[in-house]
């Protein structure tokens, strides 16, 4: 693990929400690294600030990889209704932003066959959000 990744992982547990938001953005490209994935799910389900949830979901959606969408799907399956709304808002922000998030639907298609039921369920929600982005 690089020193940069270690530092970013430390920021993911910072008491400052702004640092946690930055960590979510910075870790999104490392969604396939187990330590980063664990931290990212924690940020998606951040109990203290919805900005962390929203902006981490947006960053992961912009990545559009199967690994990044899997993490959002896991969080969607675990989230209460309020947190799920903020996850959806983050996904929507990425889909409607410059360049959109072209890989999301393809990733959801792959995750629809995932052996983990929670991932399949979450991916179905994300696919519905992507197909009808409000």
Please provide the spans of the model-predicted regions.
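Amphipathic alpha-helical scaffolding segments comprising HEAT/armadillo-like alpha-solenoid repeats
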Residues: 1-11, 31-45, 65-77, 99-112, ...
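Long, hydrophobic N-terminal alpha-helical segment
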Residues: 4-28
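Short inter-helical turns and helix N-cap capping residues of alpha-solenoid HEAT/ARM repeat scaffolds
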Residues: 15-16, 48-49, 79-84, 115-117
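Residue-level detector of extended alpha-helical repeat arrays and alpha-solenoid scaffolds
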Residues: 19-20, 53, 84-88, 120
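Hydrophobic alpha-helical segments that drive targeting, anchoring, or assembly
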Residues: 21-22, 44-61
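Structural signature of alpha-helical solenoid repeat scaffolds
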Residues: 28, 61, 92-96, 128
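Mid-chain, well-packed structural core segment of small domains
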Residues: 71-90
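Short, charged, intrinsically disordered terminal tails
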Residues: 121-134
């Amino acid at each position: 693990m690089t020193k940069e990744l270690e530092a970013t992982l430390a920021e993911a547990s910072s008491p400052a929400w702004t640092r946690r938001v930055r960590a979510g953005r910075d870790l999104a490209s490392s969604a396939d690294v187990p330590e980063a994935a664990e931290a990212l799910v924690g940020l998606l389900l951040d109990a203290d600030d919805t900005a962390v949830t929203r902006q981490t979901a947006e960053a992961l959606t912009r990545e559009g990889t199967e690994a990044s969408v899997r993490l959002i799907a896991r969080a969607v399956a675990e989230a209460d209704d309020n947190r799920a709304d903020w996850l959806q808002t983050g996904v929507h922000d990425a889909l409607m932003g410059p360049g959109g998030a072209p890989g999301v639907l393809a990733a959801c298609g792959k995750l629809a066959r995932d052996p983990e039921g929670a991932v399949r369920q979450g991916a179905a929600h994300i696919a519905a959000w992507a197909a009808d982005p409000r």
